[in-house]
Amino acid sequence: SLTRLCHALIPSMKRNGGDIINLSSLGALLPIPDFAVYAATKAYVSSLSEALRLELREHGIRVLAVCPGPVSTGFGKAARRPGFTGNMMPGRNAFDTSVETVVKDSLRALSRGRARVFPGMKIRLAALLLSIAPLGLIRFFMGRRPRKVLPAPNDSPSSAS
């Protein structure tokens, strides 16, 4: 796990130096129906990174949480089940960020000693808006986003398509 890996490497990093870059997500800032575990896990990654950053700064170890939105990698398409057509939020691709932008912005943020980075202009703007929007408004919109279609309770997983 991320926690074990970080704690296993920290003693050596204190002696020899190094940096930690953890991959979080813009989703860490949101309550996401049908993706609650994902959002909560990414919030954990961000919080762990922030705490480690404070703990390790006296040792010269920089810690960065990278919080991208959707990244243009092709992974999403490859990971879908055959015939899967649902659960694509309208306009989602408008927020895609290139891998190159994520890497460039992340390395720049690390060199500047930042705690978090939201790579790409659109994701930075989204993060800014989320930071000033009332939580009730965020809940309202997230509660109305397209949802997964789940099989009926009496359907077996093998009969659901």
Language-model features, listed with the residues they occupy:
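Active-site-adjacent segment of SDR/Rossmann-fold oxidoreductases
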Residues: 12, 30, 51-62, 72
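Active-site helix of classical SDR
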Residues: 6, 41
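A short helix-coil junction within the Rossmann-fold of NAD(P)-dependent oxidoreductases
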Residues: 8-17
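SDR active-site lid
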Residues: 58-121, 154
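Residue(s) in the substrate-gating loop at a strand-loop-helix junction
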Residues: 25
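Catalytic tyrosine of NAD(P)H-dependent dehydrogenase/reductases that use a Tyr as the general acid/base
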Residues: 38, 46
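A transmembrane-helix-recognition feature enriched in membrane-embedded lipid enzymes
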Residues: 113-145
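Active-site loop immediately N-terminal to the catalytic Tyr-X3-Lys motif
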Residues: 32-36
